[in-house]
Amino acid sequence: DGASIEIRSSDYYEHIITIAGNEGERFGDSLSTTSDGRQIIIGAPLAESNGISNVGKVYIYDRDVQRIQQTVTGNKTFTVEQTPQGRAEVYVNNVYQTNSTYYIGGTYTFTTKTATLATAPLLGDFVEIETNNVQLVDTIEMTNANQSAGFGSTVKICPTNCSVYAGAPTSNQEVPEGGSVTRAVNQSRLYGTITGTVATPTVTSGHKIRINNYVVEFTNTTLAQVVIDINNSNIPNVVASATADNKLTISLINVDAGEVANKLYVLPASSGATPLTDLGLDIFAVVQTITNPYPKDYTNFGHSISVSSDALTLVVGSPTGQSNLEVTLDAGKTTLDSDHTELRDISTQSGVVYTFDYLSSANDSILNPGKLVFGQQVVDTNVDKLSKFGNAVD
C-alpha cells in the first residue's frame, strides 16, 4: 500500500478587520505603526479641518490589549471584555504563549472571550490578551491650517513610539507650498502624566477606559467617582486625582520607575474614545511645527520623513527644494569683505534633505517640551536641477 501525504498551506497574512475612513479624504494615503504593531497612524491629506477644505488630518488607532493581574492562587482562566477579531494572542509577563489549537504543546486554549492557560500564573503575574479590536484614539489636526496643505501626506511614528510626525508638503503657512512638519507627542506615554482639559466633566456610568491596559469602568457620572474608580482598580504605580479647577489628572506615583518614553498608557476600551473626550484627555498633543530653514516657494518641505533609531534626529526631504551650499575659494583662504560676504551655489529644484536634532528642555513636560532644532542640510554635490533629491528618506 502506498502512503499518502496531505499538505495544507494558507496565506501568510490573515484578514482581520478593515479600518474605513471618510469618503474623499484619501484616508490611508500614508501609514505608520508602532514597533509592537499595537497603534496605527493613518494620514488623510484631503480631510477637512476647522471648516477649511483639503487641509488633511492624521488619525491614531489602537489595537485593543487587555491586561489582567493574577489575584487568585491556581486560577487558569482569564476573560476579556471584547470578543476577539480573528485569533487572540496571549502573553504572560510579556512572554508570548502558543495556542494549543494551532501548535503541538501549546500553552493555552481560547473559547469566545476566555483564555485557559495550561499552567496557572503566580500571584502578581499579569496576563495580556490581544483581541485585535481596533478603535480610534485621537485625531491630530494641523496648527495654522490652510487649504490644500496636504497634512498627513506622510506620517511617521518614532522608534520609541511616543512622537508622531506628519508632513504637510503643500502647506502655505510660510510661503506658497513651502511645506511643514508637525510633531505631536503621546503625553502620558512620554511624561508619565496627563491632565484633562474639561473642568467638572460628566461621564456616562458604565463607560470604560484602559490605563496601562487595565480596564477601568466608571460607576457614576461625576469626576469624584472617576477618581475613585481609577484608584480602586489598583493599577500598579498609577494614581488619579482632581486638580484645583476640577480636571482629571492621571499620573505615575513614581515617574522615575516608568520606562523611558513608555511610562503611562491611557487608551479607549469597549466604549470607544467617547469617555476620553468627555474627560478632555487629549492623548496626542501637538508640540511643534517645523518649517524649512531656507523657505522658498514650492519646495514641498515634508514630502518625506524619517526618524533615527534613537528618536533624537528627524530627517525631512524637500524634493523640489534648492541646494544652498557655501562656496569656498582657495580652500577657504580667500574671503570677501573681511569674511562678511558669502557666496552660495544654488541649484533650483535639485532637492534637499534637512536634519533636525532634539534638544530636551531643563524641565521637560507637556507645558515645556523639548524642541527639534535645525542641524544641517544634506545635498548631493553632483545633483542636477529637477533631480528630486530627497523624494524618499529612510
Task: Annotate each predicted stretch with a short phrase.
Residues 213-222:
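Short, contiguous acidic and Ser/Thr-rich linear segments
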Residues 1-3, 117-128, 243-249:
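Extracellular interaction modules
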Residues 64-102, 113, 120-133, 185-186, ...:
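Extended beta-strand solenoid/passenger and fiber regions
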Residues 85-95, 122-134, 258-272, 327-332, ...:
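Extended Gly/Ser/Thr-rich low-complexity repeat segments
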Residues 1-65, 99, 123-124, 132-184, ...:
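Conserved beta-strand/short-helix segments
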Residues 183-197, 207-210, 241-284, 327:
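Acidic, small/polar residue-enriched beta-strand/turn segments
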Residues 91, 210-211:
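A general beta-strand register signal
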Residues 94, 222-236:
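Amphipathic, non-transmembrane alpha-helical segments in extracytoplasmic/periplasmic proteins
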